[in-house]
Amino acid sequence: MATGLTPPPQPIKRPPKAVTWIIGIIALLVLVTPLTVGFYTDWLWFGEVDYRGVFSTVIVTRIILFIVFALLAGFVTWLAGYFTIRLRPDDLTAFDAESPVFQYRQMIENSLRRILIIVPIFVGLLGGLVGQRSWQTVQLFLNREPFGVEDQQFGMDYGFYAFTLPMLRLITSSLSTLLVVAFIIALVGHYLLGGIRPGNQMTGQKAFISRGARAQLAVTAGLWMLVRVATYWLERYDLLTRENATFTGAGYTDINAHLPAKIILMVISIIVAVAFFSAIFLRDLRIPGLAVVLLVLSSVVVGAVWPLMLERFSVQPNRAEKESEYISRNIESTRFAYGITDDEVTYIENWGAGGATNAEVAADEATISNIRLLDPQILSPTFTQQQQLRNFYGFPEQLAMDRYEVDGELRDFVVAARELDPNSLQQNQQDWINRHTVYTHGNGFIAAQANQVDEVARDVGSTRGGYPVYTVSDLQTNARAAESEDAEELGIMVEQPRIYYGPLIASAADGKDYAIVGDTGDGPVEYDTDSTSYTYDGEGGVGIGNLFNRAAFALRYQEMNMILSDRVGSESKILFERDPRTRVEKVAPWLTTDSKSYPAVIDGSIKWIVDGYTTLSSLPYATRTSLTEATLDSVVVDNFQQPLLTEEVGYIRNSVKAVVDAYDGTVELYEFDSEDPVLKAWRGVFPDVVQPESEISNELRDHLRYPEDMFKVQREMLSRYHVEDAGTFFTNDAFWSVPNDPTAPEGRQEMKQPPYYVVAADPDTGESSFQLITPFRGLQREFLSAHMTASSDPDNFGKITVRVLPTGAVTQGPKQAQDAMMSSDQVAQDQTLWRGSNDLFNGNLLTLPVGGGEILYVEPIYSQRRDQESAFPKLLRMLVFYKGQVGYAPTIAEALSQVGIDPAAAQDIEVVEEDGTVTVPDVNATEDADATTDGEDETPAAPAAPAGSEAEGIEAINEALRNLEAARDGSFEEYGRALDALDRAVESYQGAGTAE
């Protein structure tokens, strides 16, 4: 019979202590193991590259800072809690028995000892984790160097702003944060322990604060106000990096309103601090309360209202005059910050005012003979198809430019390393053993002279002509000495062509770019050639012969095969972190690296050259810029290149040249700006890491390039800061802008035109020089305003020359030249006809100063068969624009002739025919081609009419089109012959129309 009684609830059983401990240990291992494994494997890696001192310095610095900040944060927290407990009231009779404080006081009392331990430990750990991240700030302060340049307002050396001020900010912000934490602990603690009682009007209960609580809170608030005094003092210096509408730095309002306001607020803050301290002895809290009100009102009136009124009624009506002095400061500081002072940049004013004759242009052999036909942005598929050898080899999406001497003449080359592409491995090649122990390395260095093709491609459908002429040094060609003669002549004969390190090798989609190499006792297993295998014997790699190291890397990469596979033996090593940029950034964590590394053959070895930058976030009056935004252009977007870190800088120097060996991964850092105080400071932090500039070999120096990202940042600054007069700067009248890229694919034509590496005449000597060039257009105008070039030659490396065009003359800019070339009747007709079965690509539009006074635009046109997986781009036509005339022909010599330039110098551009002989384009043929003109009286002679009437030409085209349609279902060879026939029919028709 039911009684209606409910059985008492069963108490929840706690798990045994052993289970709790096991769960806790497992959770701890899950958190700690990845950190420990990462730490240990990184320690091994730094030992491999012989930079363990860097690793140790960083780790020791971080540990010390962690301890210091943890102890400081923990001590302040403990002290606040300790005094809160000591000063708590013993008598709670004044409290309502129903109040939360009264009910929970006993429970809190029982936990005080535990709270006083746990809370400081937690805050201390948090403070240590935050503080250790500031290791660079602390090390730079300890190893600070003077700049020898003072700011224009306070007369402080720039080194104070670069090294000391960040440290002072770190100290004040840390103290301020800890005092806020201490205040909160005291406030909450005294409330919970009965030291603070809020009033209750409904019950008539008055607010109450104990003497101990009042004293503790007053002291904490007073100390915070003293820290605030120091903060106001430091904020005076921050005014010099303030962003204004027109410029960076303190302006008239800042100097005459904000700066005095900081001093006034400092004095008031001292008064407020004294008022808080007085509350220790005085029961009346109105004194500190009134002091706080005074500070708030002063902050509003002195810190906001007064500067606003001064700006509105004094500065705005006379801004040009009022801000003139401060704009001049901004110009001077920004030029220094970005290395574009008058000592480093040469301006050639009114360049080209007198023009140049066609004869003078033709005589500019250093430029004309080096006109670039090959575009490294477009030719990667061509390199891949013609030089890939195997599916697992590859080339980067954008190839690199370098220079070598050919028969005593400097020539630019498109260069690339044939790397292993892990993303191209297919089917069983992706098996763990094959991927990580067989397909481990690339093979060879490929170079193609940029002003040379194998054969003239006169027909769009032809399978011959328009392709690079390769100079190759790899395992196969090295085995055939006769085929390596060209490589030896150019100095690119590679003694060790195997490539274990490179950006493409490190591009694995899953991030596992490692290779396991070394003798396993079963003979060579790495793929080398179709008939040979190889065993790596270089210095690179971390030994994983012992089980402990194998287990560590198995955990790092979550791969049990490292422990279980027979391919890992006692002599095995693991190669990882194989991207040259990554290796440089790890051994020099204070460097920002250029977004592009490029290969060069140095002393018989393939080396990756990486440019390293020292940067600062700000300098007084120096304009800041975003590295990502400044370096973004149509090429970077098109290639999905990894951009620089999204950081803003106010100072940058190319202070370090880094070299990474493609075979063994050795990293070498060379000083390249001995005057850079930031580099000097970092050399103090990491002694002997950066080698002196004198250690750079002549062969390496011959292949150093002016860094592209640095150049982009400088051109962005020069577009405005070439202006010296503050009044002109204020009106923006003389500003330039980087032109958009008119040759970019659709959707990217609003992106900036990239700079280009070319061999051209040196602005001073007229001799051939390897340069990085870019044009400037007027602000919001398409006409050309200036042309900037930076030399990469060892004798005058880094010299920047800006040719400033006369303002009274009008010179077409890149977009106008592109529009004129594309709207030419012949170009438009050909492109309309060809696009039916081909993809056409506009190559780099080069803006070349020629003859000491004229601008020549050159652009290659590439074609690629559509709907064919094996198709790849080839050079089809050359476009030139000169003095309003358009030249358009299969060869550069013919195109130059059409615009009235004697192509004799261009004859040095060799064309390698099918039989292997080297010939020169028939210059006389250029006299048989018509020029498309735009308001020019001077035109080449009209060509003789080809055979056949216009009607016959139309009939021939129609017949060719019918044959082409019929050949669509046939073989590629039949289709190609039909396209060739169509091209010949079109040329015949065009020739007939020209003759008429």
Swiss-Prot record:
Keywords: Cell membrane, Membrane, Transmembrane, Transmembrane helix. It comes from the Bacteria. The chain crosses the membrane at residues 19-39, 63-83, 115-135, 176-196, 212-234, 262-282, 290-310. Residues 940-950 have a biased composition (Low complexity). GO terms for cellular component: extracellular region; plasma membrane. Residues 920-950 are annotated as: Disordered. It is a multi-pass membrane protein. The keyword Cell membrane applies. Signal peptide: none annotated. The keyword Membrane applies. Residues 925-939 have a biased composition (Acidic residues). Its main location: membrane. It is found in: Cell membrane. Belongs to the UPF0182 family. HAMAP family: UPF0182. This is UPF0182 protein CE0802. It comes from Corynebacterium efficiens (strain DSM 44549 / YS-314 / AJ 12310 / JCM 11189 / NBRC 100395).
